[in-house]
Curated annotation (Swiss-Prot):
The keyword Protein biosynthesis is assigned to this record: yes
Gene3D superfamilies: P-loop containing nucleotide triphosphate hydrolases, Peptide chain release factor 3, domain III
InterPro entries: EF-G-like_DII, EFG_III/V, G_TR_CS, P-loop_NTPase, PrfC, RF3_C, RF3_dom_3_sf, RF3_GTP-bd
Protein name in UniProt: Peptide chain release factor 3
This protein's UniProt keywords: Cytoplasm, GTP-binding, Nucleotide-binding, Protein biosynthesis
Molecular-function GO terms, alphabetical: GTP binding; GTPase activity; guanosine tetraphosphate binding; translation release factor activity, codon nonspecific; translation release factor activity, codon specific
Gene Ontology biological process terms in this record: regulation of translational termination
Domain tr-type G residue range list: 11-280
Compartment annotation: Cytoplasm
Family to which this protein belongs: Belongs to the TRAFAC class translation factor GTPase superfamily. Classic translation factor GTPase family. PrfC subfamily.
NCBIfam families found in the cross-reference section: prfC, PRK00741.1, small_GTP
Function description: Increases the formation of ribosomal termination complexes and stimulates activities of RF-1 and RF-2. It binds guanine nucleotides and has strong preference for UGA stop codons. It may interact directly with the ribosome. The stimulation of RF-1 and RF-2 is significantly reduced by GTP and GDP, but not by GMP.
Length: 529
């Protein structure tokens, strides 16, 4: 392949994730994005939770029952001249770790806001995460077919609470039953709303010009007058779109629409492919790696167990950073120093998998994993480097787990270790007892683990409360002091799923006193994978 062909493939890629509060319409938008990219012909509506048409990206048993996305799926689809990789992140408020790691693998995010509610708690948390890497953000104000808050007010709230400037690209005409469409500020065109449900994309009627009498006839004189008045205000009070400010994460273009009504999503996608960055450089332990480099490199940001109930398998999701993956190529797994031939990498269309012949920077490929790959692993064509910035968080909630059938201890341990490797939960094995303690960032993770142990490993487990309030990973360069610490604190020490030593504290007071007593020991709240 010639360098110019390779450069063209790289420049076509856009890799993004959707962030939102639960129920802001993220799953619907995911489907409609795929629909506009023609990847799904029938966008199975999520509201029909009793029907068999589950949302294309919610494919695990518990997700199917609840209608929330618990695991990250990956979908690739063509749009205009580009190839778009969409990473679906869990929408439920609990799943911050998995979501966080997914956000390390994208170059851009789409923030979905319920225009009736404005900025909500989960959106704030996710925006904090994107801030750490200055990820560019596009915004979609959703649910315009319902009664919403004043759009100016919602934009002000975004600017105030999320500390990002808003630049409206489209502007709504009415809302709820009176929703008539949107006006595009940069094209001077009005797109008239016709509801399109499911997988029908309606032909949209376009009215050119703001002073066109056709506009008054189409939306009514009152709404047309209101639109002109609002636009004067908007153009005076809001920011003009500035591509540099967008790329540095300081400004977000804002689009209005209704995902359920298949309206406005294409305007946002047009903005995404026009403005979002092609695959970005990434920092490694030794240098910055640029997408256009000839040699392949990539990192694993997620491990998913049992994606195919028919095959007991685990798949490691790898973001390609540089070079080109070709079927059958030999790659070095840097952590182990082993060279492996990868002949059966997968690409995904949410649950439908197919084998990949080639992949480029920005693409996500799946590697079959028989317990040898971990989150954070770097693969190269021989270079000894590790991509940085893929963290593990100290859990905030803890339970002791025990079996209904004590003879299944081996299966329980296997299941927990596999679930901890994919980041669904963290497992701690206290050194001084045979207990198994499970740590999570949110309550729902505990339910997920018990449900998956039962459905995937045939193990029935129960939780009991345990006297642990927090955990820290510990290390110390002074061997003698560390031995003394380990001897005296044995009752509070445990090994996590990766056999890293951690201190489990019954109270924050206990942790603070221990830290004061052993100043040479480092207590870490996060750990690089």
């Amino acid at each position: 392949m010639s360098p110019s062909e390779f450069a063209r493939e790289v420049s076509k890629r856009r890799t993004f994730a959707i962030i939102s509060h639960p129920d802001a319409g993220k799953t619907t938008i995911t489907e409609k994005v795929l629909l506009f990219g023609q990847a799904i012909q029938t966008a199975g509506t999520v509201k029909g939770r009793g029907s068999n048409q589950h949302a294309k990206s919610d494919w695990m048993e518990m997700e199917k029952q609840r209608g929330i996305s618990i695991t990250t799926s990956v979908m690739q689809f063509p749009y205009r001249e580009c190839l778009v990789n969409l990473l679906d992140t869990p929408g439920h408020e609990d799943f911050s770790e998995d979501t966080y790691r997914t956000l390390t693998a994208v170059d851009c995010c789409l923030m979905v806001i319920d225009a009736a509610k404005g900025v909500e708690d989960r959106t704030r948390k996710l925006m904090e995460v994107t801030r750490l890497r200055d990820t560019p953000i596009l915004t979609f104000m959703n649910k315009l077919d319902r009664d919403i808050r004043d759009p100016m007010e919602v934009m002000d709230e975004v600017e105030r609470e999320l500390k990002i400037a808003c630049s409206p690209i489209t502007w709504p005409i009415g809302c709820g039953k009176l929703f008539k469409g949107v006006y595009h500020l940069y094209k001077d065109e009005t797109y008239l709303y016709q509801t399109g449900k499911g997988h029908t994309i309606q032909e949209v009627r376009i009215v050119k010009g703001l002073d066109n009498p056709e506009l008054d006839a189409a939306v009514g004189e009152d709404l047309a007058a209101q639109l002109r008045e609002e636009l004067e205000l908007v153009q005076g009070a809001s920011h003009e779109f500035d591509h540099e400010a967008f790329l540095s994460g300081d400004l977000t273009p804002v689009f209005f629409g209704t995902a359920l009504g298949n309206f406005g999503v294409d305007h946002m996608l047009d903005g995404l492919v026009a403005w979002a960055p092609a695959p970005m450089p990434r920092q490694s332990s030794t240098r910055e790696v640029v997408a256009a480099e000839e040699k392949f490199s990539g990192f694993v940001f997620k491990i998913q167990a049992n994606m195919d109930p028919k095959h007991r398998d685990r798949v490691a999701f790898m973001r390609v950073v540089s070079g080109r993956y070709e079927k059958g190529m030999k790659l070095r797994q840097v952590r182990t120093g082993k060279d492996v031939v990868i002949s059966d990498a997968l690409t995904f269309m949410a649950g439908d998998r197919s084998h990949v012949e080639e992949a480029y920077p920005g693409d996500i490929i799946g590697l079959h994993n028989h317990g040898t790959i971990q989150i954070g692993d770097t693969f190269t064509q021989g270079e000894d480097m590790k991509f940085t910035g893929i963290p593990n968080f100290a859990p905030e909630l803890f339970r002791r787990i025990r079996l209904r059938d004590p003879l299944k201890q081996k299966q329980l341990l296997k299941g927990l270790v596999q679930l901890s490797e994919e980041g669904a939960v963290q497992v701690f094995r206290p050194i001084a007892s045979n207990d198994l303690i499970v740590g999570a960032v949110g309550v729902l993770q505990f339910e997920v683990v018990v449900a998956r142990l039962k459905s995937e490993y045939n193990v029935e487990a129960l939780y009991e409360s345990v006297n642990v309030s927090t955990a820290r990973w510990v290390e110390c360069s002074d061997v003698k002091k560390f031995e003394e610490f380990k001897r005296k604190c044995e009752l509070n020490l445990a090994l996590d799923g990766g056999d890293n030593l951690s201190y489990i504290a019954p109270t924050m007071v206990n942790l603070n006193i221990t830290q004061e007593r052993y100043p040479e020991v480092v207590f870490r709240k996060t750990r690089e994978h």
